[in-house]
């Protein structure tokens, strides 16, 4: 998820990479007569990076938005149908416990990568236990650096999350990769946008209630 940008920052060619991507997108998205529209995905909003200089008509939809919220993952019904189609309906409870729990917009969804991998293994061995398919698919160096910098309060909040409690935080959706670990408060925005935490509602003053989504992440 963050692997490419972690390498850019670590090896100190971040500005050069931003310039390269800006030129690439300019050619591919603006001066391409054969392109009707483009759909781009990522963890963090990229508007502040200026990689879209010269382009317009963008619509940014984050995991906080309700539009297309069910398209960010599998719904309960979709997972039930998938399991049933392979004769694995009895494995729904553990699938839900391990891979459900994400709240995108107004929808509750599962991580597709995990569900697909678990069903694939169950199809050959119905005694297989759920496991962590997710962590090895991403780079976590930025998260580790932020946690290493954590003060006593932040570590206490992490412990509260691990035991199943919620914490309330203001999140920023305007971070850029090169400023992520400049402030320990950015930790919560990074954990949220990269899937380690999910939304459990809002407080009256607009803060987000955050929780660990499922057993896999714990």
Question: Where are the regions a protein language model picked out?
Answer:
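Amphipathic alpha-helical segments of the small helical/lid subdomains adjacent to P-loop NTPase cores
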Residues: 48-53, 61-120, 157, 162
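Short, small-residue-biased leader/transition segments that mark boundaries at the very start
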Residues: 2-9
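A short beta-strand-to-loop transition that corresponds to the Sensor-1 phosphate-sensing loop
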Residues: 32-48, 54-56
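A structural signal for short, well-ordered beta-strand segments and their strand-loop junctions
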Residues: 37-42, 109, 198-199
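Substrate-engagement module of ASCE P-loop NTPases
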Residues: 14-36
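Extended alpha-helical interface modules used as scaffolds for assembling large macromolecular complexes
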Residues: 58-59, 110-218
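Phosphate/oxyanion-binding active-site loops and adjacent basic polyanion-contact surfaces
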Residues: 13-21, 75, 184-187
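Generic, well-ordered alpha-helical scaffold segments in large soluble proteins
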Residues: 23-27, 31, 82-86, 98, ...
